[in-house]
Amino acid sequence: MESPIFILITLSFFLQSVLASSQTLSNSSTICKTTPDPKYCKSVFPHSQGNVQQYGCFSIRKSLSQSRKFIRTVDRYIKRNAHLSQPAVIRALQDCRFLAGLTMDYLLTSFETVNDTSAKTSFKPLSFPKADDIQTLLSAALTNEQTCLEGLTTAASYSATWTVRTGVALPLVNDTKLLGVSLALFTKGWVPKKKKRAGFAWAQPRSGSSTHTKPFRLFRNGALPLKMTEKTKAVYESLSRRKLADGDSNGDGDDGSMVLISDIVTVSQDGTGNFTNITAAVAAAPNNTDGSAGFFLIYVTAGIYEEYISIAKNKRYMMMIGDGINQTVVTGNRSVVDGWTTFNSATFAVTAPNFVAVNITFRNTAGPEKHQAVALRSGADFSIFYSCSFEAYQDTLYTHSLRQFYRECDVYGTVDFIFGNAAVVFQNCNLYPRKPMPNQFNAITAQGRSDPNQNTGTSIQNCTIKPADDLVSSNYTVKTYLGRPWKEYSRTVYMQSYIDGFVEPVGWREWNGDFALSTLYYAEYNNTGPGSNTTNRVTWPGYHVINSTDAANFTVTGLFIEADWIWKTGVPYTSGLIS
């Protein structure tokens, strides 16, 4: 039975359709033509006229209601099947419960925002950044539901008699369709038209700005301009063995570019810190901070930390700094072969917004024979990884959702080793395909954009793509590709990067026959190196060699609209194309 508030929203839908004379009124058949599934869309709405904003509010609210129902269903199945001998089944349901909770948060924020724009007689447009925020949340909500569905489908194959397929997975299919409708109507009704061009993100230019900019800090120095109290500073200096001068900002002084630290705890395996493991330090961090007092810093000294760490959504504004790549190492060995879902195989997982990691190695040692085994998964909005390394084989780095930035990082893997559906930029990184099992190939990326209205994609800018040492010395031939389309609207761009000659001349590989070859968006711009020649590249309809105008859509300010969240961390970045 629908809640009273949902009934109220439904009545409001009819009243607003009468009063909104300043908006273009249409019936559901007309409105639904703009959605991915018009037939399903028409089955959702009342048979009355309204404008796209009213239909959008209605569908987002209904998505929220369905999300609540789904959580109750999952809870019931977890309780009912707690005795099952197949751990993958329970883990898939637990993933779904976790993801559904996040989806509810995203939908509630989205509904409150769009509902505030719809007055009785007029419509108030959203700013460019606010529209991008909501499109990002709806895109992530859709990704969450599809991640759940994939996990359930895989888990259900373990038992032919298990009812999860009909009891949980099938209802979720319709919920996913409804979210696609909500995202499509939001994109049509609220996202500025210029931003919607070809589904690209668009950045409103700042005064005097250019699409070509220079990085403002040195490549790979791994140090941030931190500002902290004398007490906190003494703790940091004693462990890091790095003296922080007053106004430590490369000589710039405290000009607003310093990174404010609210407090610090330390992790050291020899007992000289506050904690001997990272998990305990994370638990000690404050909950739901707004960042106004700065970042909560966890300093992790050198050591091999065999832990599975999850940074929950309430641990906002956390910064974790290690002693360097291959010095501070977080390692695990979970894999799909051993009964974990891909989602929860991650050694390190982060959901909390505004998370920053510096000078840390994240590793999964399961090995190529264990197939999917994630080193790090990020579904954290505004998450940043600076001077870190990620080491595994298949599915090393899961850039799951929301907005992410990687600077001066090393990523090692084999099959689909950078995958997911975030809006993510890799800058000045090193991507190292390594030796897979015999008869396997390497695919650097497997981007998971499943809907044309998702503002997601993978941008690889000013990076170096070279073979890892074990691939160079391999005693059998291995083919390496820039990527393959995991989902129908997969979107990946390589630009201004060095591509070594070991990459196959065709560049890209099919996923399965002609799947997604017309709907994907793969592009290359101004790359160098013996593997960058596009003469013999694939001839798919979705593959492009682009110019600087199109490439600018995949820079930091193109994909993210605003970059203040990066600037406030002190992490260096290039906002546009490199001159």
Swiss-Prot record:
Query: What subcellular locations does the record give?
Result: Secreted, Cell wall
Quote the EC number.
Answer: 3.1.1.11
Positions of region (Pectinesterase inhibitor 7): 22-185
Q: Where is this region: Pectinesterase 7?
A: 265-564
Tissue expression remark? Expressed in siliques.
GO MF terms here are: enzyme inhibitor activity; pectinesterase activity
Task: Name the residues that bind substrate.
Answer: 342, 372, 484, 486
CDD domains, from UniProt? PMEI-like_3
Q: Name one GO cellular component term.
A: extracellular region
This protein's name? Probable pectinesterase/pectinesterase inhibitor 7
Tell me which species this is from.
Arabidopsis thaliana (Mouse-ear cress)
